[in-house]
C-alpha cells in the first residue's frame, strides 16, 4: 500500500523528535540561553533592568513551590559591583547562600542597568548538595528583589517558570542543527 506523502508529513509532524528541547527563555525582563559542551553547562543570562542594590536569580528544582530549589544569584551593589552566589531554598521565603559559589563566571558586562553574564557549572552533581542538572527539571527566573547590607531581601513581582528543562539535550551539535534549519 502506498501512503500519500501529505499523510506521511502530517504523521511526522506529531512525532516528537529526540533533539527537541527548550534551550532558551525570554520575556520583557530577562532572557537566557544554555548549552552543554562535554559535561559542562554554560548559561548566558541577561537582565534588562538590574538597578543598584538589587538581585536576580535562576532557580532549579521541582519544589514543591519555591522550596528545595538550587539557585544562582546575581547581585549589583551600590558601587556597581556584580557578585554571583549559589544557594538553596530549604523553605519558602528563605535562601541560604553557599560559603563558596560552585559556578564559574566567564563573562560579565554591565551597561547602564543591562546585565549580561555567562556562568558555567558541571552538568552533573555540583556544590555542597551535589545538585545535578543532567535530568529534566524546572527552571525558575526570579527577576529580583532588594539587596540590603549584603542580604537578599524577598523578591518582588512575578516569577517565571520554564517547565521540564532538559539541559543535557542542549548541545553544540543540536544548536548548530537549529541554526542551520533557520537559515534554509
Curated annotation (Swiss-Prot):
Gene Ontology CC: one annotated term: extracellular region
Sites carrying sugar chains: 49
Domain DOMON: 28-145
Stored InterPro entries: DOMON_domain (IPR005018)
Record carries keyword Glycosyltransferase: no
Cited SMART domains: DoH
Cellular compartments annotated: Secreted
Chief localization: secreted
Keywords: Glycoprotein, Secreted, Signal
TM ranges: none
PROSITE patterns membership: DOMON (PS50836)
Domain of life from the UniProt record: Eukaryota
One matching Pfam family: DOMON
Name of the protein in its database record: DOMON domain-containing protein CBG21755
Lineage of source species: Eukaryota, Metazoa, Ecdysozoa, Nematoda, Chromadorea
Amino acid at each position: 500500500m502506498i501512503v500519500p506523502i501529505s499523510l506521511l508529513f502530517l504523521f511526522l509532524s506529531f512525532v516528537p523528535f529526540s533533539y527537541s528541547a527548550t534551550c532558551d527563555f525570554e520575556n520583557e525582563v530577562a532572557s537566557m540561553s544554555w548549552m552543554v559542551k562535554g559535561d559542562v553547562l554554560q548559561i548566558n543570562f541577561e537582565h534588562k533592568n538590574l538597578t543598584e542594590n538589587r538581585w536576580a536569580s535562576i532557580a532549579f528544582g521541582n519544589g514543591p513551590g519555591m522550596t528545595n530549589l538550587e539557585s544562582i544569584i546575581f547581585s549589583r551593589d551600590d558601587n556597581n559591583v556584580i557578585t554571583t552566589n549559589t544557594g538553596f531554598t530549604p523553605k519558602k521565603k528563605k535562601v541560604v547562600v553557599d560559603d563558596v559559589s560552585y559556578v564559574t563566571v566567564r563573562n560579565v558586562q554591565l551597561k547602564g542597568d543591562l546585565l549580561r553574564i555567562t556562568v558555567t557549572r558541571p552538568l552533573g552533581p555540583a556544590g555542597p548538595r551535589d545538585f545535578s542538572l543532567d535530568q529534566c527539571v524546572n527552571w525558575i527566573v526570579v527577576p529580583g528583589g532588594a539587596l540590603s547590607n549584603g542580604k537578599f531581601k524577598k523578591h518582588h513581582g512575578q516569577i517565571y517558570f520554564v517547565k521540564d528543562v532538559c539541559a543535557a539535550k542542549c548541545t553544540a551539535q543540536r544548536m548548530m542543527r537549529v541554526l542551520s534549519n533557520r537559515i534554509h
